[in-house]
């Protein structure tokens, strides 16, 4: 891409540059999130260490783009210069465009001080994005000390590429972040009119290794008054899942709509079965067969015949 094209996109999408006080209401990602019947933030980027290089991975439609914009909101609240934050969705780009992006944005950003680079959909670049980021961290002294957040949808591709970034992650102590769909605990709080009292639930989920018989008995005893509600919420959660789009549709209408079904099928086709090169029809049939066979023995050859 040409520098002028990149700069035009930056000024049209980084709304906080021109409107640092009221950009949130103008931003399409945050505006869509505010239309949801609940407020939810995964908080996976709340503790960025300046100078770190972070990779945030997770399935499509889980809210990574919104999380990036909320990071912008938090940085501005902390007093960061709006022009020191550059956000770009690089869907459809090639690796060389990343270098052009850094050079073009550099001319529009403050000449001194730390900067924040929030690069969305990095895994859409299929010709070596990690090697290009590595080169920039090695050869651009200022970019090397900047805070960089890269997001991607395909965890397998990200895992394959993250090795190239070894030694270039800066002071980040936890550089690899994962954003997953909403868990059952949060789902209950969002959809239930009378969720369990705070004192009835542990402040944080327990690790599997910590689920001793005594702790399980204690938790079951404390949650017994809400057993009927939790059982109903669990059935809903198994049906709805934790993608924010699905949870919002459930809260609004309690029934899924066709557009939601298609959106979530795109998540599955684009992430889970991306390397299988299955058609949408084959993907749908595979999901149907897997759902029918839950709890019974699995025959891979039989499944292959059904989707062939």
Model-assigned labels for residue ranges:
Residues 1-51:
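A short, basic N-terminal segment
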Residues 56:
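Hydrophobic anchor at the beta1->P-loop junction of P-loop NTPases
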Residues 63:
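Conserved glycine(s) of the Walker
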Residues 67:
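Hydrophobic positions on the alpha1 helix immediately C-terminal to the Walker A/P-loop
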Residues 82-112:
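Short glycine-rich substrate-engagement loop in P-loop NTPases that contacts/grips substrate
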Residues 110-133:
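Conserved P-loop NTPase "ATPase switch" module shared by AAA+ and STAND
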Residues 139-165:
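Sensor-1/coupling segment of RecA-like P-loop NTPase cores
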Residues 159-291:
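Interdomain motor-coupling "hinge/lid" segment immediately C-terminal to the ATP-binding subdomain
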